[in-house]
Amino acid sequence: MPEGKYSYHEPVLLEEAIASLNCRGGGIYVDGTVGGGGHAALILERSAPDGFLLGMDVDGDALQAAEKRLMPFGRRKTLVKANYADMRKVLADLKILQVDGILLDLGVSSHQLDAAERGFSLLKDAPLDMRMDSEAGRSAYDVVNTCSERELKDIIRKYGEEIMAGRIARAIAEKRKDTPIKSTTQLAAIVAGALPGGFRHKKIHPATRTFQALRIYINNELSNLHRAIFDSTDCLKPGGRFSIISFHSLEDSLVKNGFRSLEKGCICPADMPVCACGQSPRLKVITRKPISPCRDEVEANPRSRSARLRTAERI
């Protein structure tokens, strides 16, 4: 397999993300979204000869792909089926007190998008699912067919930032009266049909934001990310790096504000003359502006175009 190409998923911002971690021999690192193992493999290469990596993912398919790709690194890695929000517990179970770096890549993998049966892609006809862990939780089918019209409107508006959320929710509620909405293409057509003509000729498919909203809601993505930022920071050694690759404004805003909050420390009101909360800064922000893919990467991998990398360092 050519260097930099992966059959499961091509990692985004590969060099930039790994460079941001300042990998060194003997270091301990966590890839909380190990996917096909692309980022993890380079972390292990850069932390040779005795660096260690914990790879986590809720997707069983991803872990199988990562196990195969990382096999040459032998006992220098451990893979665990778990959500990155539970990183502190997983590390405690492994009796690892602190680590030198943490990486999260929040994007849906190419494999998840291309595997029609996972139900992530609006362009491939498949049963509505969208669960990162296909064995747990409610599927997109459950949400689309059982949530009230008001609940659907709130989900689509909050997590998809879709200004036509009301029209879309109404169209879904009307359509499912006749028969359950079962497939991705069926849902995509309903959403597209609910929008005025001017909304159907933009660069992205008219159902993109609705599919994003459902995926985020079903997988608790934003709450898991918030928990990971504030809990996992304490797992870092002083000088350890926390790097996160986000793919849409909701994620990027959460990462930016989370890092800034942990850099500030004090949460007292601005008009208080003396700090009463006792909270001290825990991070130093390294990337004041996020790092984006270069033109060559976007041309080679169009799915990388919206990626943003932010890094902070443990104080």
UniProtKB/Swiss-Prot annotation:
Transmembrane segments: none
Keywords from the named record: Cytoplasm, Methyltransferase, rRNA processing, S-adenosyl-L-methionine, Transferase
Gene3D superfamilies assigned to the protein according to its UniProt record, in alphabetical order: Putative methyltransferase TM0872, insert domain, Vaccinia Virus protein VP39
Localization: Cytoplasm
Listed InterPro entries: RsmH (IPR002903), SAM-dep_MeTrfase_MraW_recog (IPR023397), SAM-dependent_MTases_sf (IPR029063)
Top enzyme category: transferase
One Pfam match: Methyltransf_5
GO terms, molecular function: rRNA (cytosine-N4-)-methyltransferase activity
GO biological process: rRNA base methylation
Residues binding S-adenosyl-L-methionine, per UniProt: 37-39, 57, 91, 105, 112
Chemical reaction(s) catalysed: cytidine(1402) in 16S rRNA + S-adenosyl-L-methionine = N(4)-methylcytidine(1402) in 16S rRNA + S-adenosyl-L-homocysteine + H(+)
This enzyme's EC code(s): 2.1.1.199
GO cellular component: cytoplasm
NCBIfam families the UniProt entry points to: 16S rRNA (cytosine(1402)-N(4))-methyltransferase RsmH
Family, per entry: Belongs to the methyltransferase superfamily. RsmH family.
Function description: Specifically methylates the N4 position of cytidine in position 1402 (C1402) of 16S rRNA.
Protein name (Swiss-Prot/TrEMBL): Ribosomal RNA small subunit methyltransferase H
The encoding gene: rsmH
